[in-house]
């Protein structure tokens, strides 16, 4: 057996032909140097400094979000096909007993090994998938195809490549084993909105049916399901990574779909320039209202089961995840995953630390729940139980969410009802017990006080430094107050429940700032016409000056928690976007000679209409 060890990782060269048939070029040498000579904790700073899409793509922890929420059994054996540079390998190894990773490239496999060299449960086999599959004797609980199925014609040439490929995968699974697939949606909304097709870099190539492309292909939901069913799998479950599967932050399912105003993070074209034909957030809202999100989701995550009678039992068997939010764009001590799942007919919410450093942050929620601090008899925190170190669990509460009550009232023009609900929100926040007069402390300033001094006007001298937080002295404040007391986290059932209380500090926070956050994070209230907005501000008794100060405090806090996020990185990346203005694609352009943006936009309009008609 031709093997070597890199750290604890076993490299298997039995199927390696002596040369790499696939390479991304010089960037692989750069990546190998980084993972050899730098700890993973240094990767975020390297990404920020590089301003490079390949480095971001291969080293960002956000990549792991496609699987770090998935409830692998702790004794599972997982085969990862097309492991590449190992962006996801380590996340699987953290959950499963054993990972066997296959990749065609020795160089990419070495990057994988060096970045995961501390893990003792990874074997990397370098070689062609068909050769490796023919030689494998072990059967696996899971096989992952993350960004792999679309290359099925390269793995298995022929007229029915994708079904043949999936049938070969089934041969590597135990009875009742599962294949996990992540793939772009051929009809993803981003392609209509002006993004290039991910694999070939051409506008409209996928949604026009890959008329000029062979060797790589993505599929609509309907076609993908037919391919998987036709390969002999059953119990096919779809999930919808947002914004896409490559850098996802949220996983939706048919049991838990996004609501209007939620899908706002759409400029993610780090890898290539794009056009912007329309406001994707507004179109997403239309799709959500029409019940079409699942058809136009930018990516799919699919779980499909190989039939069999020998399903093994474990601590996770029977759980069905309906939603996951992966909060890894944070400092290590705050990284968590929130998951909604069903087990034995009951729904639960789980919050789990991503690493040991974040365990204390999660455990604090269970400690806080025991005391139900500063709330009244009829307003309480949803119960919380610590089920393991760094893992807490809540019952899933059904009832009327306050944010939906507000949104529906505004949408239906029932403004007096909306104001009534906002008064109720204000009362819940402002009438907690344990109030004290606010004083600025060093702890408070560390989190909320990193506010830059205003720049002097041209020709003027820099004014004496002022403390922008000083105006808050004497405000009503509370220690350990729940920072997440926004309308979306307040639900009316047998009592008024606060659903989320991840964020609280042991120093006093002004209650007006909590009220500000409840308005800031409600999309409906933020887009009100000016006159209604004025009434709203009078109702919550927050002045324009206070609003601006609270915005700066919010920015300071987010920076304290996250450092530099992907959204922060976007302006510094080489890829750009071009907004196609309305006058360029109106129905009756003034000039008979159409511009390229106009022609493109007309094409998009026709495609969307055709797709919607086909869906019907």
Where are these regions (language model features)?
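N-terminal auxiliary segments of SAM/dcSAM-dependent transferases
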Residues: 1-38
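ATP-binding glycine-rich loop module of kinase domains
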Residues: 325-370
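Catalytic activation segment of kinase domains across protein kinase-like and atypical kinase folds
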Residues: 209-210, 468-528
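Conserved structural core of kinase catalytic domains
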Residues: 381-456, 460
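A short glycine-rich, Lys/Arg-flanked "PGG" loop and its adjoining helix->strand segment in the class I
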Residues: 160-178
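C-lobe/activation-segment region of protein kinase-like
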Residues: 499-586
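Conserved SAM-binding loop of SAM-dependent methyltransferases across substrates and taxa
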Residues: 85-96
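Conserved class I S-adenosyl-L-methionine
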Residues: 180-203
């Amino acid at each position: 057996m031709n093997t070597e060890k890199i750290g604890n990782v076993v490299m298997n060269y039995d199927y390696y032909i002596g040369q790499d048939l696939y390479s991304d070029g010089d960037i692989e040498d750069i990546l190998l140097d980084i993972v050899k000579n730098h700890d993973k904790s240094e990767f975020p700073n390297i990404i920020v400094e590089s301003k490079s899409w390949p480095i971001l793509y291969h080293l960002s922890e956000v990549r792991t979000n496609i699987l770090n929420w998935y409830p692998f059994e702790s004794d599972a054996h997982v085969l990862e096909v097309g492991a590449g540079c190992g962006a996801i390998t380590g996340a699987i190894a953290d959950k499963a007993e054993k990972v066997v990773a296959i990749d065609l490239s020795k160089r990419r496999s070495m990057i994988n090994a060096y970045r995961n060299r501390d893990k003792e449960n990874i074997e990397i086999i370098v070689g062609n998938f068909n050769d490796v599959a023919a030689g494998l004797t072990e059967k696996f609980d899971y096989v992952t195809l993350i960004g792999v199925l679309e290359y099925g014609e390269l793995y298995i040439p022929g007229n029915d490549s994708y079904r043949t490929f999936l049938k070969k995968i089934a041969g590597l699974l135990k009875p009742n084993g599962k294949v996990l697939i992540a793939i772009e949606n051929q009809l993803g909304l981003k392609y209509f909105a002006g993004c290039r097709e991910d694999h070939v870099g051409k506008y409209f190539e996928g949604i026009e049916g890959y008329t000029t492309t062979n060797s790589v292909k993505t599929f609509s939901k309907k076609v993908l399901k037919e391919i998987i069913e036709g390969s002999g799998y059953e119990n096919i479950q779809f999930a919808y990574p947002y914004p896409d599967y490559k850098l996802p932050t949220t996983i939706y399912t048919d049991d838990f779909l996004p609501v209007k105003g939620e899908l706002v993070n759409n400029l993610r074209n780090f890898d290539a320039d794009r056009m912007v034909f329309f406001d994707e957030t507004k179109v997403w809202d239309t799709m959500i209202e029409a019940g079409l999100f699942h058809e136009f989701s930018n990516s799919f995550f699919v779980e499909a089961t190989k039939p069999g009678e020998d399903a093994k039992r474990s601590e996770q068997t029977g759980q069905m995840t309906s939603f996951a939010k992966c909060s890894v764009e944070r400092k290590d001590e705050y990284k968590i995953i929130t998951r909604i799942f069903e087990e034995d007919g009951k729904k639960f919410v789980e919050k789990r630390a991503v690493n040991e450093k974040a365990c204390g942050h999660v455990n604090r929620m269970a400690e806080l729940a025991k005391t139900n601090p500063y709330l009244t008899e009829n307003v309480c925190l949803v119960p919380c139980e610590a089920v393991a170190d760094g893992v807490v669990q809540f019952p899933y509460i059904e009832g009327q969410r306050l944010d939906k009550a507000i949104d529906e009232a505004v949408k239906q023009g029932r403004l007096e009802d909306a104001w009534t609900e906002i008064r109720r929100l204000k009362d819940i926040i402002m009438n907690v017990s344990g109030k004290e007069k606010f004083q600025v402390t060093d702890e408070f300033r560390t989190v909320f006080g990193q506010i830059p001094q205003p720049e002097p006007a041209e020709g003027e001298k820099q004014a004496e430094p002022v403390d922008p937080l000083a105006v808050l002295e004497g405000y009503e404040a509370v220690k350990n107050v729940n920072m997440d007391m926004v309308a979306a986290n307040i639900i009316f059932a047998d009592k008024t429940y606060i659903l989320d209380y991840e964020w609280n500090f042991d120093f006093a926070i002004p209650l007006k700032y909590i009220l500000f956050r409840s308005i800031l994070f409600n999309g409906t209230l933020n887009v009100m016409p000016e006159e209604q907005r004025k009434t709203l501000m009078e109702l919550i008794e927050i002045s324009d000056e206070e609003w601006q100060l609270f915005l700066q405090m919010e920015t300071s806090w987010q920076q304290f928690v996250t450092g530099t996020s992907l959204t922060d990185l976007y302006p510094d990346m080489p890829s750009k976007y071009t907004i196609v203005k309305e006058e360029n694609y109106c129905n009756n352009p003034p000039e008979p000679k159409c511009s390229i943006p106009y022609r493109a936009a007309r094409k998009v309009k026709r495609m969307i209409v055709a797709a919607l008609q086909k869906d019907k």
